[in-house]
């Protein structure tokens, strides 16, 4: 009985605020899955029936919903996330041609991902280029595969994830998320993959972050309060907050610079969000007037955006107590793009606007 309600619960959650045609599509998708899975016999003695397969499909769909994707992408994510379902022709007949067409692109992309892994970085770069060329017809297909991998890595406490899968994630999935500008997905894929590949290193960095959490939070809170006051005096409307650091990026920086954990300045980091570009540079002036900046650690990605259109000002300063501090400054629009990348506009296209989120 619990299984029967999985689709209904998921539908009630993700359909809120979507237009009627999108809700109808999601309902057709759930009905299709129920019909197919309820009619399938267990595949072997180790098969727990449809429960885990349903959970994976709807879990992938939930991740795509959290990315503000449209109903077609959610439907494809749910269907693609459940193995051993009938093919594209069945989906076309029961759910609709647009969903079937996108599912076909997902399967094509999956074929590129399943090619034998190259051992050299140049080979991996070539695979990524081929992957990007393949997905040009519909970028949403890439988001479906990223959501699948993210679901599997999140579930690693219940389902074993091999070091090979984690390595593939670091060489293909995480860079793909970066190219698409979906930074929080990239960071989570990297952190979870490191936990699989280097569990002791992951635990050690996590432990050190936890041990210093109180000290770090007190420091950041004081910095945030001081910066808010100075921005207010300068009549700059801005949101200032601490910025979380990610275990994989900390580990990579420790490796690249041969540093110990305590030597990493950007474990202490804050973010400033302004209303327009002019105020970004004005806020930068305030930061540099408060604390001495480190010229080699300054990057202007507003004037010179990254290839995935990421824009922000990055600076590092000698903050209070002579501790180094990283500061990122960007507009709220730039921040939305940095968080969701190419996924940012799909719900607007579907209808319902941001209220649908």
Q: How would you label these PLM feature ranges?
A:
Residues 19, 65-72, 94-97:
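Short, solvent-exposed loop/edge-beta patches enriched in aromatic
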Residues 1-19, 27-28, 35-42, 46, ...:
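Nucleic-acid processing machinery
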Residues 78-111, 182:
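Hydrophobic or amphipathic alpha-helical targeting/insertion segments
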Residues 50-54:
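Helix-turn-helix repeat elements of alpha-solenoid scaffolds
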Residues 55, 59, 69-79, 85, ...:
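Alpha-helical scaffolds flanking conserved acidic
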Residues 29-33, 73-80, 102-107, 142-150, ...:
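Short alpha-helical scaffolding segments that buttress acidic/His motifs in well-ordered protein cores
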């Amino acid at each position: 009985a619990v299984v029967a309600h999985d689709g209904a619960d998921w539908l009630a959650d993700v359909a809120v605020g979507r237009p009627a045609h999108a809700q109808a599509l999601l309902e057709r998708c759930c009905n299709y899955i129920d019909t197919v899975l309820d009619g399938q016999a267990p595949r072997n003695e180790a098969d727990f029936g449809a429960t885990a397969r349903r959970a994976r499909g709807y879990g992938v769909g939930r991740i795509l919903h959290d990315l503000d994707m449209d109903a077609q992408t959610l439907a494809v994510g749910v269907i693609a996330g459940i193995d051993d379902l009938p093919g594209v022709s069945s989906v076309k007949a029961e759910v609709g041609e647009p969903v079937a067409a996108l599912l076909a692109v997902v399967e094509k992309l999956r074929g590129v991902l399943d090619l034998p892994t190259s051992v050299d970085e140049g080979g991996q770069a070539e695979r990524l280029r081929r992957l990007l060329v393949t997905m040009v017809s519909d970028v949403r297909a890439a988001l479906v595969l990223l959501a699948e991998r993210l679901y599997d890595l999140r579930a690693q406490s219940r389902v074993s994830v091999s070091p090979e899968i984690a390595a593939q994630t670091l060489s293909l999935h995480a860079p793909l998320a970066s190219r698409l500008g979906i930074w929080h997905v990239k960071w989570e894929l990297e952190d979870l993959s490191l936990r699989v590949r280097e569990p002791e290193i992951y635990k050690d960095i996590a432990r050190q972050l936890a041990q210093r959490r109180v000290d770090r939070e007190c420091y950041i809170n004081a910095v945030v309060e001081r910066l808010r006051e100075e921005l207010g005096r300068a009549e700059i409307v801005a949101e200032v907050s601490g910025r979380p650091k990610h275990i994989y990026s900390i580990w990579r920086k420790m490796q690249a610079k041969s540093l110990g954990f305590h030597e990493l300045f950007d474990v202490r980091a804050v973010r400033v969000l302004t209303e327009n570009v002019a105020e970004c540079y004005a806020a930068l002036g305030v930061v540099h007037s408060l604390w001495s900046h480190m010229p080699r650690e300054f990057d202007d990605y507003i004037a010179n955006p990254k290839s995935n259109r990421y824009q922000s000002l990055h600076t590092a300063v000698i903050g209070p107590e002579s501790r180094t501090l990283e500061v990122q400054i960007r507009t709220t629009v730039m921040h939305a793009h940095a968080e969701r990348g190419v996924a940012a506009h799909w719900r607007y296209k579907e209808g319902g606007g941001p209220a649908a989120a």
